[in-house]
Amino acid sequence: MSGASVTFEPGARTAWHTHPLGQTIIVTAGCVCVQRESGPVEYVRPGDVVCFSPGEKHWHGATLTTAMTHIAIQEKKDGKVVDWMEHVSDEQYRGEK
């Protein structure tokens, strides 16, 4: 199992990705944008916990105006914790699909 406290500056976000054994994020500061494949952009705040199922395609990041920090927890499978995919477009980031 691995975990880290991660900070994103305003406008920063991950690429689309999956975790072979899932991921849990715990928001500790700011506001986090989260989107699962085919779902809307959701906004989560300090104290909120978000769980992603194994293989669930998603991204997360800060809002355009607010930095954020979250604790990310995931387990390794065959030495791997993440599979990176395509970048999140500006339209996806803004929730325009």
Residue locations for each model-derived region?
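Short beta-strand His + acidic residue motifs that chelate non-heme Fe in jelly-roll/DSBH
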Residues: 14-16, 34-35, 52, 57-63
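Glycine- and acidic-residue-biased ligand/ion/polar-headgroup-sensing regions
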Residues: 19-38
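A generic "binding-loop/recognition-motif" signal
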Residues: 12, 20-21, 40, 56, ...
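A short glycine-rich, His/Asp/Glu-containing loop-to-beta-strand
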Residues: 1-15
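Short acidic-glycine-tyrosine-enriched beta hairpin
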Residues: 38-55
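Double-stranded beta-helix
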Residues: 59-97
